[in-house]
Each structure stands twice: as C-alpha cells, then as structure tokens.
Regions:
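An N-terminally biased module of ancient metal coordination in phosphate/nucleic-acid-related enzymes
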Residues: 1-86, 90, 99-102, 164, ...
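Extended substrate/RNA-proximal surfaces in nucleic-acid metabolism proteins
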Residues: 49, 53-190
Length: 248
C-alpha cells in the first residue's frame, strides 16, 4: 500500500484553484499518512494567448507561512511536507540554485515542461513533425537540463511528452529511445537523484504511468534506488490517483 503522495498542486499553482484544506482532507479520506505540496515554479514559461499564462510562479513568502499553518493544524493526522516543482531549463540553473538555498523546501521535483521554448501541452512542437522526432528531442533536452541543473531531488514524469503526442504511446517504447533514456537514468543516478513514478499518465488516457514501467525496471537494473510516487493532482479528487494500480 502506498501511503504518501509526493506530488500535488494547490491554488498557489497557476493551473490549479484547489484549496489546501481540500487536498489534505482528500488525502485523509484515502488513507494517506504523508503528502507533499509541490506547486509550480516554471520561470520563463512560453506565453500563450489562449491561456494568458506568462509564467508559473509562486509567492513563496505567502506559501511557506500558509503551509506551516496547515502543517500545524493537521500535525496529529497527517505529515505535510513543503515542496516545489521546478520547470527545468538550462539557463535557469543559477536562479533555481539560489531559490532552493534561500527557502527550506523539504522536497524538490525537477520536471521538463518546456523543450526549446515550447511546452508539448500546446501542440506546436508536433506541427510538421513525427512523434518520434519530438520524443527524441525531449529526451535530449532532458539531458541538457541534467547537465546544467542540480537543484532538485527527483526527476518528475520523465516521459511527460508522450501524453501529448499525436499518436500518444502507439509508437512509443523504452527500446525505441533506449540510448537517450539510459543516458538520462545514468546521469540521474550519478547525481544522487531519484525519479518519480507519476500516476497521472493513466489519468491522461495512457496505458501506463510516468515513466513507462520498462523505464522503471531499467532504472533499477542500472542501480537506481530512489523512486517517489506522486499523483500530480490539481484537484482533490485526483489525490492518490490510481495508487492501487501503481502498487500492483
């Protein structure tokens, strides 16, 4: 049984309006013993007219006192950790290092949402290109990020890009990108970092979590030891999403 959800978002994230109390109460109803709030900081996020989003930023001077308040209020019921999800881009290495040194995060996820100025979520990166090309570019961009940024604990949803491919996972497998993925996993291990098992893949219609189970197995084969589990919930009903399936 998985009793900790290490990836969830609240109203402090640009893409969520969830109240912290509601997320905590949902976790309690689902029998969790620990949660980590990991709201988004994606500095220099590409602007999109349809959303009006210029950046995913968190007011940390409000965030930390608010989390401390809820941590104390629920101290006898559940452990609440103070986390953050950083959107990795190589040029932000210094900014993130300063940020994580300045604020006492309990846990930091490093995720690749932006690939050479584009978030696969919006689809432009796939225009006139095959899924194969974009997936490979994303894995290579992940390596670029790992070479530049070290201010995180685990690498989030490694194959996030597959959610948004034109064919999603129909032409996707670990074997097809083994060279790039192995380099990512070896780099993560050498850095003393971990990877995340993110159950949101199922929520987005994939037949697997992030990363693909073959990648999780390969990570272990290469000597990887750190795997955290997170739902990537942006709403209370998605806390601990499909955790039973992940446990199986």
């Amino acid at each position: 049984m998985i009793t900790s959800d290490s990836h969830m978002h609240t109203r402090f994230s640009t893409d969520s309006d969830a109240d912290i109390r509601d997320m905590i109460e949902s976790a309690l109803k689902k029998g969790l013993q620990s949660i980590c709030i990991t709201d988004h900081i994606d500095k220099d996020y590409p602007f999109h007219e349809d959303t009006g989003v210029e950046a995913f930023l968190v007011d940390l001077d409000e965030y930390f006192p608010k989390l401390a308040e809820w941590k104390e209020a629920y101290a006898e019921k559940i452990q609440i950790r103070r986390g953050i999800e950083l959107g990795l881009q190589p040029h932000l290495a210094g900014f993130y290092e300063e940020l994580t040194n300045q604020y006492p995060f309990d846990f930091v996820i490093g995720s690749v949402h932006v690939v050479h100025g584009m978030d696969p979520y919006y689809g432009e990166i796939f225009e006139g290109r095959s899924d194969e090309e974009v997936y490979k570019e994303t894995f290579l961009a992940t390596l670029e990020n790992l070479d530049a940024v070290s201010s995180f604990d685990v690498l989030g949803h490694l194959d996030y890009v597959v959610r948004y491919g034109k064919c999603q996972a129909r032409q996707y497998s670990y074997k097809k990108y083994a060279q790039e993925i192995d380099e990512i996993l070896k780099k993560v291990i050498a850095m003393g970092k971990g990877i995340e098992l993110n159950t949101a893949g199922w929520k987005y219609g994939l037949a697997f979590c992030h990363p693909h189970p073959e990648i999780l197995c390969r990570y272990k084969e290469l000597g990887g030891e750190i795997i955290t589990v997170g739902s990537d919930a942006h709403k209370p009903e998605h806390v601990a999403y499909d955790f039973q399936k992940a446990a199986d």
